[in-house]
UniProtKB/Swiss-Prot annotation:
Signal peptide: none annotated. It is a multi-pass membrane protein. It is found in: Cell membrane. It comes from the Eukaryota. It holds the Pfam family 7tm_1. Receptor for extracellular UDP > ADP = UTP. The activity of this receptor is mediated by G proteins which activate a phosphatidylinositol-calcium second messenger system. The gene is P2RY3. It comes from Meleagris gallopavo. GO terms for molecular function: G protein-coupled ADP receptor activity; G protein-coupled UDP receptor activity; G protein-coupled UTP receptor activity. This is P2Y purinoceptor 3. The lineage of its organism: Eukaryota, Metazoa, Chordata, Craniata, Vertebrata.
Amino acid sequence: MSMANFTAGRNSCTFQEEFKQVLLPLVYSVVFLLGLPLNAVVIGQIWLARKALTRTTIYMLNLATADLLYVCSLPLLIYNYTQKDYWPFGDFTCKFVRFQFYTNLHGSILFLTCISVQRYMGICHPLASWHKKKGKKLTWLVCAAVWFIVIAQCLPTFVFASTGTQRNRTVCYDLSPPDRSASYFPYGITLTITGFLLPFAAILACYCSMARILCQKDELIGLAVHKKKDKAVRMIIIVVIVFSISFFPFHLTKTIYLIVRSSPTLPCPTLQAFAIAYKCTRPFASMNSVLDPILFYFTQRKFRESTRYLLDKMSSKWRHDHCITYGS
């Protein structure tokens, strides 16, 4: 039986969390089995075409790197939850795994924001030259700034996340130990605002402007925009899907959970209901590590063509070998 103790003010609650033993290992296993090869392929494809890097593919490379680093930590979490929250890997590893999760989460959000701004400039300001003058050099500097901001935002995870003891078993707390919930609250809310709400607002502003241009009559749109229309629409759809599945539900339930667990007078059933809602959305926040490579596939024509060529070649070889086997 998986149980968690929670203390808030005068309340001392014990949560029943058997669902984590099934849901979390299942989702994390899917993310690991799909995310590891998909992101490795994206990085490999970009590396092979490194002489023809564009600003978008540079952002995609950094996005795939963040995803790949995160999915490599998932076997530890899969083991943890299949063993009823038992964490045998030590306090530093606990902190580092939680740090990887939030670094990937907010890094993905910021790199998707950069990609959206890049696409916005191409659609709404196709003749502007200021963002093209330094080209790839400026893009690499932006990526370095994103990594710096994300690491700085997530470093307090090493302070708050830690191991603890529940029912004589070592566990790894995600946000903070229950007795530090009040001190974690300001940081958790600040991280949500700076790491999710502000980038999300920027993405919405870009997409609203892009939608206005894309919905204009054909004769009012330049030829350069015509060529980018389908690509932009695909990107908008996929980014909206990523936010709908991975980012928005997680941050909504996390914010509510932070508020209720800092309230000393709420009854235990209410605390448990919000804890379950938050912990059910947490594994789906990892799904962006699978969805991000799909974004790359549908927005990069050369990658689609090379992938189809590889699949056709493999299929032809299989049919050839199959015919030889039966022919003999």
